[in-house]
C-alpha cells in the first residue's frame, strides 16, 4: 500500500498565473458600444457619472472593436444590421465577450417579424442575457459584474447563461 506518486498536478507557476490573468481581464473590461435602440440610452446613462463604471474597471467605452473585449448589443438587430454586427464581432480580439442587453437583443422583444433577428445569439455567442425593456442602468451594472465573475472564475467558456 504505497502512495501513488504519479498523480496529475497543475504546475505551481501555471495555476496562479492563470488566476492572475483572469483577474486582470475581469477588472479591465473595455466595452464596445453597439447601441441600436432605446436600450442604448440606458447604456449611455450607465456610463455617466451617477453610476461610476470606473470603480468596476469599465470606464472606457471604445468606438473601435479592435480595442475592446466586450460587446454590449443594446436593442433590436435588423436583418440589414446582422452582417455589420458579425463583422464587428469578428474584428474584436480574443478573448471577447457579448452581453445581449434588453428583450429585443435577447429574443426579438415585441418585434416578432421577418425584419428583426429573434435574438443575437443566432449571430454571435452570448455570455450574459439582460432582460428588460429597457433594462435600468443598475441591471446593466449587475450584468457586467456577472460577466466579471464568469471571467475571473473561468466560466467564460459556458456561453448563454441567463441573467434575469
From Swiss-Prot:
Name the GO terms of the biological process aspect: aerobic respiration; electron transport coupled proton transport
Cofactor dependency: [4Fe-4S] cluster
Cellular component GO terms, alphabetically?
Answer: plasma membrane; respiratory chain complex I
Q: What class of enzyme is it?
A: translocase
Main subcellular location: membrane
Q: Which keywords does this chain's UniProt record carry?
A: 4Fe-4S, Cell inner membrane, Cell membrane, Iron, Iron-sulfur, Membrane, Metal-binding, NAD, Quinone, Translocase, Transport, Ubiquinone
Claim: Cell membrane is one of the keywords in the record = yes
At the top level of its lineage, which domain of life is listed?
Bacteria
Q: How is the cofactor bound?
A: Binds 1 [4Fe-4S] cluster.
Q: Which reaction does it catalyse?
A: a quinone + NADH + 5 H(+)(in) = a quinol + NAD(+) + 4 H(+)(out)
Q: Return one GO MF term.
A: NADH:ubiquinone reductase (non-electrogenic) activity
Give the Enzyme Commission number. Answer: 7.1.1.-
Membrane topology of the entry: Peripheral membrane protein
Entries under InterPro entries matching the protein: NADH_UbQ_OxRdtase-like_20kDa (IPR006137), NADH_UQ_OxRdtase_20Kd_su (IPR006138)
Q: Where does [4Fe-4S] cluster bind?
A: 38-39, 104, 133
Localization recorded for this chain is: Cell inner membrane
Instruction: Enumerate the Pfam families for this protein.
Output: Oxidored_q6
- Give the function comment from the record: NDH-1 shuttles electrons from NADH, via FMN and iron-sulfur (Fe-S) centers, to quinones in the respiratory chain. The immediate electron acceptor for the enzyme in this species is believed to be ubiquinone. Couples the redox reaction to proton translocation (for every two electrons transferred, four hydrogen ions are translocated across the cytoplasmic membrane), and thus conserves the redox energy in a proton gradient.
Its quaternary organisation is: NDH-1 is composed of 14 different subunits. Subunits NuoB, C, D, E, F, and G constitute the peripheral sector of the complex.
Q: Which family does it belong to?
A: Belongs to the complex I 20 kDa subunit family.
How is this protein named in the record?
NADH-quinone oxidoreductase subunit B
Q: Which organism is it from?
A: Protochlamydia amoebophila (strain UWE25)
Amino acid at each position: 500500500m504505497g502512495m501513488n506518486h504519479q498523480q496529475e498536478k497543475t504546475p505551481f507557476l501555471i495555476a496562479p498565473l492563470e488566476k492572475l490573468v483572469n483577474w486582470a481581464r475581469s477588472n479591465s473590461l473595455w466595452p464596445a458600444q453597439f447601441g441600436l435602440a432605446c436600450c442604448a440610452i440606458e447604456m449611455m446613462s450607465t456610463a455617466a457619472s451617477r453610476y461610476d463604471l470606473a470603480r468596476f474597471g469599465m470606464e472606457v467605452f471604445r468606438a473601435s472593436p479592435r480595442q475592446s473585449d466586450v460587446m454590449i448589443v443594446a436593442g433590436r438587430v435588423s436583418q440589414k444590421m446582422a452582417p455589420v454586427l458579425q463583422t464587428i464581432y469578428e474584428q474584436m480580439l480574443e478573448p471577447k465577450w457579448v452581453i445581449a442587453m434588453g428583450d429585443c437583443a435577447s429574443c426579438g422583444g415585441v418585434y416578432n417579424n421577418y425584419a428583426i433577428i429573434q435574438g443575437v445569439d443566432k449571430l454571435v455567442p452570448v455570455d450574459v442575457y439582460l432582460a428588460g425593456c429597457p433594462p435600468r442602468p443598475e441591471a446593466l451594472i449587475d450584468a457586467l459584474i456577472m460577466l466579471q465573475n464568469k471571467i475571473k472564475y473561468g466560466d467564460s467558456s459556458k456561453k448563454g447563461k441567463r441573467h434575469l
